Amino acid sequence: EQGIGDIIQFSRYIYLLEKKYSANIIIKTDKKIAHLFSKSKFKLIFNEDNIPKYDFYKHLMSLPKIYYEKTKTFPSQINFIPKDKKITLKWKERLNEIKGFKVGINWQGRKTYGVDHLRSIPLNYFNDLFNIEKINFISLQKGFGLEQIKNFQHKDKLYDFSKEVDNGENIFEDTIGILQNIDLVISIDSSLVHLSSTLGIKTF
């Protein structure tokens, strides 16, 4: 129904449905993030032609409204994302070499998104943050936006691991490892902000 970020953000409601009704749940999702549901019992499909027989259906983005109408609350953070211990340890060792408070930063979204100009922030707008002492910044960019680092005033204070990150079949696998080993995330509205929040990382 929506993008990858929305799927990550609102999938918590699917887990609430499963818990309350003990239902067999079928999710049509993006194949690139199938591994994020590996701990669940959900049946995943990636093509509308392969939808099996079902009793009820609902669009993912409708679930928050239904839940709120019934409870007048929003569910607390539910971390359903599996962790790869090997990858997490790899990034723990790498990031331990960087002493002090670590902030992950994501400033540029996918340029092909229709209103990307309303969400992405030029890297140089963050200049003042880089003047704060004892703060280390970790770039969480992959692809779009990396070209801005070359002319960034504080590029010597920005750690860029983009060439080592998420080069396998499973999107976000290294990003998750990095997120679990930093203190804070500052991000535009992209899939990454929903990923870090779901993992329980303090996110702005």
Question: Which residues does each PLM region occupy?
Answer:
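Catalytic machinery of carbohydrate-active enzymes
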Residues: 1-204
